[in-house]
């Protein structure tokens, strides 16, 4: 028994069986493939399933016997049934939007199959010339919003004289065909796509000289890349403690994986490089270790400023900056400008406000101090900054940032014979405070204080949570990734920004002069301006004059284009993909930060510290 032939309507709405264009009330639309069918040409067996969403004979797989010769209509066990199953699976996928379902159905019906083309392949196919079906070379965008290669467009519009779009058959203005303009925003998008593609291919990668901590020697060493001999270009040796760079306070035994005793007061090292390996003071040149938004963790007394005064249990420390280090100068003793409370100086002031403990190391280079070691670098315990101010330095020309450090450690100082550590003591009298400016004295209770019940110094508030990864290479990797995300965002804002609102394009339209605007911004720019201007004054009747609507970026007349501006859909998809990737990256970054911070967190103040110039504070080192 043969199968009866049943044919749908074509793209123009004409029935392919009776060659009649039926009205809409005489057609049925399939709920699966969305194809119209002429009711009069359908067999009664096909209309029997009209309850709910009607399915056409091709999708339902209904076999109608007939005496006619066999045709190619599929039965329930043929490939047509497989096609219907695939279409139904697409329709049942709740993760897809209607537009994505339509694309998948179209690709399936055209023979491409629902092979699950990955997102990267989709992105590659988003921009293509409608003539050569390749990435546009010097892309040109027509007023109807379709993109072509410059050569293809010239061959189509100028060489063949066709002034209609190949895709939508919209009319192309003669001035656009005669003088096409390259869309620079699409050029940047294509270049960025090519760079991303090349970065994923196997190429000669840049060599990164990475040595893991466990593979480093015990002492600082020089590599083959060192320019100078000695320790001028030396690399750091192995780190013996497991603390992050922004760790506050003493280094406990739990972080000493080698000796299980922590770093004790009075320990000495040969130089700053070895001191760095034990985490007491990480910078091997700078005297202050800290961050302006977090606080200062440690300082080094090494004779850098003549203004420093060392009295053992307390000392006056000078901030950094104000010296000309241009010309690759590492040290300059002459003060050339005022110091300001920013960067490292701001970190010290924040530690003063919050009452954080600051580790102090003294170097043999401090020749004017009786408490400095004879050789090497020595750890002298933790101090607390009680006051900070500005005052003219000993050179008599420029202001210096000054800090009062007072010792508050549970271990005795190296220069004393005491068996116990420090106790709260009165603050010393500092004569230079009489002429000080920008004086700040902590009023609130400090984070590091003395517990009378336990008789020792400890954290009275939760210590600041570390914001740095322990692994140096992991920290560098995160920094590079964040820098790359910022660069991507900056490029997105620059290349795909509206020329009116300066924001990322929303519903982008490309003018005949190849400028890109938000559709709403461009329409609002010329809102209320009619196409023609009536010049009749009641006495004389003149012809209506055309209003010139000049492009906001050039002198091109956009009056004809503004009659029906078309959105550049391909560019809009590119922008949406960029935004989606940015949102995913931000969510991933925020989740990583939340995992590192944990449940308890003590945030430093985010607002700028307000200085109380009239307050001189208490006269004792409070607990």
UniProtKB/Swiss-Prot annotation:
Boundaries of every YDG domain copy: 258-407
ZnF start-end (PHD-type): 12-62
Tissue: Expressed in inflorescences.
Catalytic activity from the UniProt record: S-ubiquitinyl-[E2 ubiquitin-conjugating enzyme]-L-cysteine + [acceptor protein]-L-lysine = [E2 ubiquitin-conjugating enzyme]-L-cysteine + N(6)-ubiquitinyl-[acceptor protein]-L-lysine
Basic and acidic residues composition-biased segments: 604-613
Source organism, top-level taxon: Eukaryota
SUPFAM superfamilies in the cross-refs: FYVE/PHD zinc finger (SSF57903), PUA domain-like (SSF88697), RING/U-box (SSF57850)
Listed InterPro entries: PUA-like_sf, RING-HC_ORTHRUS_rpt1, RING-HC_ORTHRUS_rpt2, SRA-YDG_sf, SRA_YDG, UHRF1/2-like, Zinc_finger_PHD-type_CS, Znf-RING_euk
BP-aspect Gene Ontology terms: negative regulation of gene expression via chromosomal CpG island methylation; protein ubiquitination
Region annotated Disordered, chain positions: 580-623
Effect of a null allele: Decreased DNA methylation primarily at CpG sites in genic regions, as well as repeated sequences in heterochromatic regions. Released transcriptional silencing at heterochromatin regions. Ectopic CpHpH methylation in the 5S rRNA genes against a background of CpG hypomethylation.
Primary localization class, coarse: nucleus
Localization in the cell: Nucleus
Pathway note: Protein modification; protein ubiquitination
Residue ranges that the Swiss-Prot or TrEMBL entry lists as coiled coil: none
Zn finger spans (RING-type): 129-169, 498-555
CDD domains reported for this sequence: RING-HC_ORTHRUS_rpt1, RING-HC_ORTHRUS_rpt2
Function: E3 ubiquitin-protein ligase. Participates in CpG methylation-dependent transcriptional regulation and epigenetic transcriptional silencing. Mediates ubiquitination with the E2 ubiquitin-conjugating enzyme UBC11.
Stated name of the protein: E3 ubiquitin-protein ligase ORTHRUS 5
Organism from which the protein derives: Arabidopsis thaliana
């Amino acid at each position: 028994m043969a199968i009866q032939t049943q044919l749908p309507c074509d793209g123009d709405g004409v029935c392919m069986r009776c060659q009649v264009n039926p009205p809409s009330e005489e057609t049925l639309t399939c709920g699966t493939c969305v194809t119209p069918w002429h009711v009069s040409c359908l067999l009664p067996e096909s209309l029997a399933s009209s309850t709910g969403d009607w399915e056409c004979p091709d999708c339902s797989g209904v076999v109608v016997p007939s005496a006619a010769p066999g045709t190619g209509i599929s039965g329930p066990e043929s490939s047509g049934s497989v096609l219907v199953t695939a279409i139904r699976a697409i329709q049942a996928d709740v993760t897809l939007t209607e537009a994505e379902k339509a694309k998948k159905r179209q690709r399936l019906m055209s023979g491409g199959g629902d092979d699950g083309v990955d997102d990267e392949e989709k992105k590659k196919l988003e921009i293509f010339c409608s003539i050569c079906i390749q990435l546009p070379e010097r892309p040109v965008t027509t007023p109807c919003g379709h993109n072509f290669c410059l050569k293809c467009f010239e061959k189509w519009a100028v060489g063949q004289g066709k002034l209609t779009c190949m895709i939508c058959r919209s009319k192309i203005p003669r001035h656009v065909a005669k003088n096409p303009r390259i869309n620079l925003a699409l050029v940047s998008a294509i270049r960025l796509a090519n760079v991303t593609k090349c970065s994923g291919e196997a190429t000669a990668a840049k060599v990164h000289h990475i040595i893991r901590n466990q593979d480093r020697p015990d002492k600082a060493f020089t590599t083959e890349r060192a320019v100078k001999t000695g320790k001028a270009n030396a690399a750091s040796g192995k780190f013996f403690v497991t603390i992050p760079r922004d760790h506050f306070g003493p280094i406990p035994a739990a972080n000493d994986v080698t000796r299980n005793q922590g770093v004790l007061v009075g320990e000495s090292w040969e130089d700053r490089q070895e001191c760095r390996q034990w985490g007491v003071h990480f910078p091997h040149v700078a005297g202050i270790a800290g961050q302006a938004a977090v606080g200062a963790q440690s300082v080094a007394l090494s004779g850098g400023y003549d203004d420093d005064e060392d009295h053992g249990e307390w000392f006056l420390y000078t901030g950094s900056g104000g010296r000309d280090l241009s010309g690759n100068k590492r040290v300059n003793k002459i003060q050339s400008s005022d110091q300001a409370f920013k960067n490292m100086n701001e970190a010290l002031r924040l530690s003063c406000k919050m009452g954080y403990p600051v580790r102090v190391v003294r170097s043999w280079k401090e020749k004017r101090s009786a408490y400095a070691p004879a050789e090497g670098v020595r750890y002298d315990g933790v101090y607390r900054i009680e006051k900070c101010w500005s005052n003219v330095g000993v050179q008599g020309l420029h202001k210096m940032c000054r800090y009062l450090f007072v010792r508050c450690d549970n271990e005795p100082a190296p220069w004393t014979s005491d068996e116990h550590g420090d106790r709260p003591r009165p603050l010393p009298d500092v004569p230079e405070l009489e002429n000080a400016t920008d004086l700040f004295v902590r009023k609130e209770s400090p984070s590091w204080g003395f517990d009378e019940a336990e008789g020792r110094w400890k954290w009275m508030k939760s210590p600041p949570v570390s914001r740095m990864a322990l692994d140096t290479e992991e920290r560098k990797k995160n920094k590079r990734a964040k820098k790359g995300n910022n660069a991507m965002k900056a490029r997105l804002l620059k290349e795909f920004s509206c020329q009116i609102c300066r924001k990322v394009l929303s519903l982008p339209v490309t003018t005949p002069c190849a400028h890109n605007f938000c559709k709403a911004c461009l329409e609002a720019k010329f809102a209320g301006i009619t196409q023609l201007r009536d010049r009749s004054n009641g006495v004389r009747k003149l012809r209506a004059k055309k209003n010139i609507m000049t492009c906001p970026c050039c002198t091109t007349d956009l009056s004809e284009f503004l009659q029906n501006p078309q959105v550049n859909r391909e560019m809009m998809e590119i922008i949406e993909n960029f935004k989606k990737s940015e949102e995913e990256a931000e969510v991933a970054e925020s989740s990583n930060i939340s995992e590192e911070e944990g449940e308890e967190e003590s945030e430093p103040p985010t607002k700028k510290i307000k200085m109380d110039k009239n307050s001189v504070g208490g006269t004792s080192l409070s607990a």
